[in-house]
Amino acid sequence: MYRAVTRQIEVTVEPNFVPEQSSADRSRYFWSYTIVITNSGEETVQLKTRHWIITDATGRQQEVKGEGVVGEQPTLAPGERFEYTSGVPLSTASGFMTGRYQMVSESGERFEIDVPTFSLDSPDNKRVLN
């Protein structure tokens, strides 16, 4: 599990390779990832936007920006958490993702929180060491 905390908001990520949606012959590899956002602060916050940078094993990057996550802009009161699962395809057997969420506080302040960088590894990823 990967973890980041920004302004008392914790984001954890658990990636999982999905072999039944992947095919090495077609250079298609798919991962699901489950994210839990926990508000340990003292103020209610709302997730407004997401910004992802997805990098494959060749260094090719894809940038994804959008409103909310999985069609929602969750509001988290102190002590509340929000969990969702999404997915990402790559044309290589490994890669990584990193990102940020834009949040807005109850008082109207906008700020960003980090999503921890997490690794996408498949069983087909052959590493050669000397």
Swiss-Prot record:
Where does the ApaG domain lie? 3-127
InterPro entries in the record, alphabetically?
Answer: ApaG_domain, ApaG_sf, Uncharacterised_ApaG
| GO annotation (BP), single | error-free translesion synthesis
The protein's matches in SUPFAM superfamilies, at most eight in alphabetical order, are given as: ApaG-like
Determine the domain of life of the protein's source: Bacteria
Instruction: Report any Pfam family annotated for this entry.
Output: DUF525
- Return the PROSITE patterns for the record: APAG
This chain belongs to the protein called Protein ApaG
Q: What is the lineage of its organism?
A: Bacteria, Pseudomonadati, Pseudomonadota, Alphaproteobacteria, Hyphomicrobiales
